[in-house]
UniProtKB/Swiss-Prot annotation:
The gene is penD. The lineage of its organism: Bacteria, Bacillati, Actinomycetota, Actinomycetes, Kitasatosporales. The keyword NAD does not apply. The keyword Metal-binding applies. It comes from Streptomyces exfoliatus (Streptomyces hydrogenans). It comes from the Bacteria. GO terms for biological process: antibiotic biosynthetic process; pentalenolactone biosynthetic process. This is Pentalenolactone F synthase. GO terms for molecular function: dioxygenase activity; L-ascorbic acid binding; metal ion binding. Its EC number is 1.14.11.36. 2-oxoglutarate binds at T132, W250, R276. Its cofactor is Fe(2+). InterPro entries: PentlctneF_syn, TauD-like_sf, TauD/TfdA-like, TfdA_dioxygenase. Belongs to the TfdA dioxygenase family.
Length: 298
């Protein structure tokens, strides 16, 4: 397996020669983790196209893959696999998504059990547009002064599924749930709204990130609404800065794996007359409290 940093990119590396199934050996498994921690985004190329089952098994090597909870838009036999597309067949929408810009986010931040790693595979791509952008949110935290870091560690943030998507989620999962909130068992798929600390910590590397997004972050609950909006806008202005962002131009067969805790991602718009069809799985942390053991900055 060969890992090559992407020339001129702020983050990201291309991986050739990987065994993209669940039965990879321990050496490759550890090499992929190390590469992800170093580069945050990995682009797998030159591999045999995995079946749906192999794609799911590959993702499961890197954490628990929850079901999407969607009533439509997921693979009919494997609800864990999200179909992302603008495809319409016989008047019926296939998957979720459209050709418009999709704002900065990290998957499942509105659930108490947040995402750890994302996996997105390109099945069909448009001739232009549809790139996925990734911004390093560890870099944002590391740019803060010690005083700013200490203040940020005291804040909690409400995340919620974006308006208009609630009806696609199973009704029993539509609620606000927070870790330690009620003592009841929390299912991996539970929740469409939750509260998390503003600062997250990668349990493997110890790096800390500012855990917010434009798409799913509603407000900092410890601040007045106007103060919350002002600070969130200031922090989110980091997203998309070229010195901290990688724009991935898709090729059919690409599998991109990324650190969901330390990055946010967005999708560029494309011509709706063209097709963009992807399949995605997301792993969550085995211990849902792992991302929230951040130590207060000195």
């Amino acid at each position: 397996m060969d890992v090559t940093p992407i020339p001129g990119a702020a983050l990201g590396a291309v991986v050739h020669g990987a065994h993209v199934t669940g039965d990879m050996d321990k050496t490759q498994f550890e090499e992929i983790w190390a590469a992800l921690d170093a580069h945050l985004v990995l682009v797998f190329r030159g591999h045999r196209t995995p079946s749906y089952e192999e794609f799911l098994a590959f993702g499961r090597r890197f954490g628990y893959i929850p079901k999407t909870g969607l009533t439509s838009g997921a693979h009919p036999d494997h609800n864990e696999i999200l179909i992302v597309s603008n495809l319409v067949e016989d008047g019926r929408k296939i998957g979720v998504g459209d050709a418009e810009w999709m704002g900065w986010h990290t998957d499942y931040s509105f659930r108490p059990r947040v995402s750890q790693v994302g996996f997105l595979e390109a099945v069909e791509v448009p001739s232009c547009g549809g790139e996925t952008l990734f911004t390093d949110m560890y870099a944002l935290y590391e740019s803060l002064s010690p005083e700013e870091r200490k203040r940020m560690h005291s804040y909690r943030v409400r995340h919620a599924m974006r308006t208009g998507y609630e009806e696609t989620i199973e009704e029993k999962l539509q609620r606000e749930v927070s870790l330690g909130g009620s003592g009841e068992q929390i299912l991996p798929e539970d929740g469409t709204s939750t509260i998390h600390p503003l600062i997250a910590r990668n349990p493997r590397t110890g790096r800390q990130s500012v855990y917010i997004s434009t798409l799913n972050t509603e407000r900092i609950v410890d601040l007045a609404p106007d103060d919350s909006r002002k600070l969130l806008d200031e922090l989110l202005s980091h997203a998309g800065k070229p010195e901290h962002t990688y724009a991935h131009t898709w090729q059919p067969g690409d599998i991109v794996m990324w650190d969901q805790l330390g990055t946010v991602h967005a999708k560029q718009a494309f011509d709706p007359a063209e097709l963009r069809v992807m399949r995605q799985v997301v792993s969550i942390f085995d211990d849902p409290t792992d991302p929230w053991h951040a130590e207060v900055a000195a």
